């Protein structure tokens, strides 16, 4: 998973 998905 990309870090931008970790909101």
Swiss-Prot record:
Chief location bin: secreted
Location within or outside the cell: Secreted
Example of a GO biological process term: neuropeptide signaling pathway
Modified-residue entries (Leucine amide), positions: 7
GO cellular component, as recorded: extracellular region
Alphabetical UniProt keywords: Amidation, Neuropeptide, Secreted
Signal peptide positions on this chain: none
Cited function: FMRFamides and FMRFamide-like peptides are neuropeptides.
Similarity-based family: Belongs to the FARP (FMRF amide related peptide) family.
Protein name, UniProt field: Extended FMRFamide-1
Species whose genome carries this gene: Striatophasma naukluftense
């Amino acid at each position: 998973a990309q870090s931008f998905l970790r909101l």
